[in-house]
């Protein structure tokens, strides 16, 4: 926010940036929308494990529009491979079964914001190993979870 109270429309890039990490994403349109978000916020996008689509699939490209050339994209075998490549990135895990809200997370530039696959989320063993780093987005009523692209947007903009 500027001194006169008007919202700042353009943010300066963070160094180090927040990293968007998707573990085995299944729906190409979600990944395409998240890629556009990554481009808009200059946040690297990391895809881990087996994808439910080919990254060159038309639906992925279409959802990301013409912003793919602006996305820093890395693919990793798994979370261990990601951690090996980015040892200083603190993992912040997001899950529909979390007990704490994302609003309680202490975000720091350089954090890796980790989201699981659309159908089942993150591996329960990973969540159990890192209980202090697991957060969720509260929902009311019978809705179990939010769309992955929406969840990533909510968390990333809160972190920024």
Q: Locations of the language-model features?
A:
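Post-transcriptional modification and biogenesis factors for structured RNAs
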Residues: 1-160
């Amino acid at each position: 926010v500027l001194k006169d109270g008007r919202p700042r429309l353009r943010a300066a890039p963070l160094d180090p940036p927040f990293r968007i990490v998707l573990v085995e994403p299944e729906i190409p349109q979600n990944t395409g929308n998240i890629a556009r978000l990554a481009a808009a916020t200059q946040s690297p996008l990391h895809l881990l494990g087996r994808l439910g689509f080919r990254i060159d699939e038309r639906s992925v490209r279409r959802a990301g529009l013409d912003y793919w050339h602006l996305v820093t994209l890395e693919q990793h075998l798994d979370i261990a491979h990601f951690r090996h490549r980015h040892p200083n990135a603190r993992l912040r895990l997001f899950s529909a079964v979390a007990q704490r809200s994302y609003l309680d997370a202490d975000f720091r530039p350089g954090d890796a914001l980790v989201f699981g696959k659309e159908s089942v989320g993150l591996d329960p063993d990973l969540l159990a190993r890192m209980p202090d780093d697991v957060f969720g987005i509260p929902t009311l009523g019978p809705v179990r979870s939010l769309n992955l692209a929406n969840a990533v947007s909510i968390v990333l903009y809160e972190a920024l």
